[in-house]
Design a protein with these regions (language model features):
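Short, small-residue-biased leader/transition segments that mark boundaries at the very start
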Residues: 1-8
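Conserved phosphate- and dinucleotide-binding cores of soluble alpha/beta proteins
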Residues: 9, 14-18
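N-terminal catalytic or cofactor-binding beta/alpha core of small enzyme domains
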Residues: 17, 35-38, 70
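Solvent-exposed alpha-helices and their adjacent loops that cap or buttress functional pockets
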Residues: 19-25, 76
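His/Asp/Glu-rich, glycine-adjacent segments
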Residues: 23, 34, 48-49
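Short, structured patches in soluble enzyme cores that scaffold and shape functional sites
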Residues: 29, 34-37, 55-57
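Short, glycine/polar-rich helix-capping loops at beta-to-alpha or helix-loop-helix junctions
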Residues: 37-48
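Catalytic cores of soluble, metal-dependent hydrolases
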Residues: 45, 52-160
């Protein structure tokens, strides 16, 4: 399923109703970037929930910078804070070989660093996670080092 933890915890109100009862994140405020392989059930669930999705086809069609501008605008107009969940397997395996799922035609390291910098510039990031780094599959710590660089950019590090 697309949201395994929310599905699992849906029946545990003591975990889902922290601070107040009800939904904490509206699906319409969720944005995915770089999707390459969604199964039919995931696609239907995301469409039904109103999740915004920019696939790698969209990146090719409209250009990466344009998509990032749309994402920044999407969040700055809709929310007061952002949680970033960056899944390293969105990257092309050439740049991140140490992930569990290695699909070709993913984001480049430069695109990912640019994305993190632009999201950081919104000053809306309140929490983040960088996931899917598998050291067993990594080559010369390439994926791990990139993950650290991405976190640094998200925390405000600039090249210049």
């Amino acid at each position: 399923t697309l949201f395994p933890y929310t599905t699992l915890f849906r029946s545990l109100p003591e975990l889902t109703n922290l601070y107040y009862e009800g939904t904490k994140v509206d699906a319409k405020d969720i944005c995915f970037l770089g999707t390459r392989d969604l199964d039919k059930g995931e696609r239907e669930l995301m469409k039904k929930a109103g999740v915004t999705v920019f696939s790698m086809t969209d990146v090719e069609r409209y250009g990466f910078s344009s998509i990032v501008q749309k994402i920044v605008q999407f969040f700055t107009e809709r929310v007061d804070m952002i949680h970033v969940s960056f899944d390293m397997d969105v990257l092309d395996p050439m740049f991140a070989p140490g992930t569990g799922i290695q699909l070709p035609a993913g984001l480049s390291n430069r695109e990912a660093l640019f994305l993190m910098e632009e999201i950081a510039n919104t000053n809306l990031v309140k929490s983040a996670e960088i996931v899917e780094v598998n050291p067993v599959l990594d080559i010369r710590n390439q994926t791990a080092i990139l993950a650290v660089s991405l976190a640094s950019r998200l925390l405000g590090e600039k090249i210049y």
